A protein has these predicted regions:
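Conserved Class I S-adenosyl-L-methionine-dependent methyltransferase catalytic core
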Residues: 3-24, 29-30, 35, 44, ...
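Alpha-helical subdomain
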Residues: 1-67, 156, 161, 165-329
Length: 329
């Protein structure tokens, strides 16, 4: 590492903001499958022609567009991930990250005080915020392929019932149902979130097949009698005591021999690796009471709750998570 590394690190936000603005302005959908000049793009976008040319050139330099004979085209990457019509569209996640820009301005204060820069309400206070957050999670998992991969990989032999806690858009239950239609699947989540979940399930055409249960896992009892309880990206949003209590609740809700499956960033004992997890912990500092936890911490919560046969498995890239499983006696 040298000066260039530090220089790039300090200025990395510039590329992020260019991408955020391009998605906000709908540049990729506007260009679509045809080449477009700066003049035509500015006319369709209702933007300044000079400024439009500058951002189109920047997006080309960032390998998000191609430029030939003064016309701009989408490339394979932007066609797959930045067109709203693509099944792998990632734009929802980019919009959400853009909406967090002002939150990051509060980082120094958050470190001084130890308090989040944003009220940790899981984006439930404002309906638009709820939809932005939940659909961002849907776009992330769909674009990266997590749900499809796990639905194929997880051993569901002998499983008759599954509960997804904090499912958000329901992306994982949808994939599991399509792979294992004989399993009775339930989702337990906050009422504001379930309004968005219903839309996703209706779009997938399987709304009646998945049961939606409204509740707060920190305050309410969990429904009972499941062979598998799944929770993805939940523990990083909670503090140690809340996670320990949640494992106790999950143990009580499982059938004998049932399994808990946790998918999350799982850190090494130094809490510095993987890099994405250490950085994501700062995100959690800004917006929740949580952080990313080490395997030794998760293992202890599970053991204290009574789980046995605890295992972990790192998922392949581009997924950045680990699966931790435990079995009820």
């Amino acid at each position: 590492m040298d000066f260039t590394y530090l220089d790039n690190l300090s200025g990395a936000y510039a590329e992020s903001r260019i991408l955020h603005a391009a998605v906000e302005l709908n540049i990729f959908d506007t260009i679509g499958d045809k080449g477009m000049s700066t003049e035509d793009a500015a006319a369709k976008l209702h933007t300044d022609e000079r400024a439009t040319g500058l951002i189109l050139n920047a997006l080309t330099a960032m390998n998000l567009l191609k430029k030939e004979d003064n016309l701009f085209y989408l490339n394979d990457l932007s066609k797959k991930y930045l067109l709203s019509t693509s099944e792998a569209c990632y734009a929802g996640m980019i919009r959400f990250e853009s909406s967090m820009w002002n939150v990051w301005e509060g980082l120094s204060k958050a470190i001084r005080t130890g308090k989040p820069a944003r009220i940790p309400d899981m984006y439930q206070t404002n309906r638009d915020d709820t939809e932005c957050f939940i659909m961002a999670m849907h776009h992330l998992v769909s674009a990266r392929g997590d749900a499809t991969y796990l639905a194929e990989k997880l051993n569901m032999e002998g499983v008759n019932s599954l509960l997804d806690i904090g499912s958000g858009p329901g992306t994982y239950p949808v994939a599991i149902y399509k792979r294992h239609p004989g399993i009775s699947i339930s989702i337990f989540d906050l009422p504001g979130t379930l309004d968005i979940t219903r839309k996703v399930l209706e779009k997938e055409g399987i709304r009646p097949r998945i049961k939606l249960i409204s509740g707060d896992y920190n305050k309410d009892s969990l429904p009972q009698g499941f062979d598998v309880i799944f929770l993805s990206n939940i523990i990083h949003g909670e503090d140690e005591d809340a996670n320990s209590n949640l494992m106790q609740k999950i143990y009580s809700s499982l059938n004998p021999g049932g399994r808990v499956i946790i998918k999350d960033h799982i850190m090494d004992e130094s809490l510095t690796k993987p890099t994405c997890g250490a950085i994501f912990s700062i995100y959690m500092l800004l917006t929740t009471k949580g952080r990313d936890y080490g395997y030794h911490e998760v293992q202890k919560w599970l053991e204290d709750a009574g789980f046995i046969d605890i295992t972990r498995e790192d998922l392949p890239q581009p997924m950045s998570s680990t699966i931790v499983c435990g079995k009820k006696v």
